[in-house]
Amino acid sequence: MSYLIKPQNYKPLLDLKQTELGIKQIKEFFQLNLSSELRLRRVTAPLFVLKGMGINDDLNGIERPVSFPIKDLGDAQAEVVHSLAKWKRLTLADYHIEPGYGIYTDMNAIRSDEELGNLHSLYVDQWDWERVITAEDRNADFLKEIVNRIYAAMIRTEYMVYEMYPQIKPCLPQKLHFIHSEELRQLYPDMEPKCREHAICKKYGAVFIIGIGCKLSDGKKHDGRAPDYDDYTSKGLNDLPGLNGDLLLWDDVLQRSIELSSMGIRVDKEALLRQVKQENQEQRLELYFHKRLLNDTLPLSIGGGIGQSRLCMFYLRKAHIGEIQASIWPEEMRRECTALNIHLI
């Protein structure tokens, strides 16, 4: 079901023309900073991939991809990508990228099973990135170093926005707070995971939650992850499981946390075998991507995605992602947004 968060007395700080210019400037500035921080080369990415190769991402493992038949391939099915986590790792191998360097791309996707609302659209645009690492890099300290570099690019971009539009005051804290999902559960034991995220983000402003996908001490997961890209079972922060996480910011307009990036150190052979066994999905090991990984023809890597529209939405103090990107929305939501001074593109 769709949802709509209704901020009180919302008034956009920018008109439509200023908004479009702001979107352009943010996207250009941030991707250059991201590229230089992580030493990433821009590459061209697919909008769709062949079904049955194990290349498309399953996200939480339940989302259905948009698919269509290809006439010239005997009606073989293609799937519109959800994200490019596995494709990027294959590309690192094909491009023979050295450790310490990587790639990024403008990723466009369709997620038809999304619950539409202020933060969720059918259309997804993000910077998908992947970087080759060594076995010695597969630890929580290295994960935190990479996350802090990404956050540094975010801080610089926020100041650039302030230079363009002085009415938009910087609000990001200079330091990002790290916490494991188990520590977060113990801090707020009576809350649901999303409410924990809101509480910790309201306190610190910017938070990276480590260990997304691993089982916590209550037997539950903070959130789901497909078992074949992020490593969420190897020991990480404070000897707790997980070498991945989510970067979240406190949004003053919506008065809640928003997830800007999901990322992590990717599974090696041992973590892949362990995680697919835990999830009873060992049949995946017969797919092309998984065979490449098991045969040691893919590099060790770290990677993730950074939401472009959400980042712009945060910087420009917008109440709805539809003020940043063009998509399809329920008619009732459009009417309500108009009444709330939220102008959907």
Curated annotation (Swiss-Prot):
Annotated EC: 6.3.1.1
Cystine pairs:
none
Q: Which InterPro entries match?
A: aa-tRNA-synth_II, aa-tRNA-synth_II/BPL/LPL, AsnA
Q: Please name the top-level EC class of this enzyme.
A: ligase
Q: Where does this protein reside within or beyond the cell?
A: Cytoplasm
Pfam families tied to this protein: AsnA
Could you tell me the superkingdom of the organism this chain comes from? Bacteria
Q: In which pathway does it act?
A: Amino-acid biosynthesis; L-asparagine biosynthesis; L-asparagine from L-aspartate (ammonia route): step 1/1
Can you name one GO molecular function term for this protein?
Answer: ATP binding
Q: Which UniProt keywords apply?
A: Amino-acid biosynthesis, Asparagine biosynthesis, ATP-binding, Cytoplasm, Ligase, Nucleotide-binding
Which reactions is this enzyme annotated as catalysing? L-aspartate + NH4(+) + ATP = L-asparagine + AMP + diphosphate + H(+)
Q: Name one GO biological process term.
A: L-asparagine biosynthetic process
Question: Is Nucleotide-binding set as a keyword in this record?
Answer: yes
Q: Which CDD domains match?
A: AsnA
PROSITE patterns listed in its UniProt record: AA_TRNA_LIGASE_II (PS50862)
GO cellular component labels = cytosol
The answer on whether this UniProt entry bears the keyword S-adenosyl-L-methionine reads no
Q: Which family does it belong to?
A: Belongs to the class-II aminoacyl-tRNA synthetase family. AsnA subfamily.
For this entry, the protein name equals Aspartate--ammonia ligase
Q: Which organism is it from?
A: Bacteroides fragilis (strain ATCC 25285 / DSM 2151 / CCUG 4856 / JCM 11019 / LMG 10263 / NCTC 9343 / Onslow / VPI 2553 / EN-2)
The upper taxonomy is: Bacteria, Pseudomonadati, Bacteroidota, Bacteroidia, Bacteroidales
Gene (UniProt): asnA
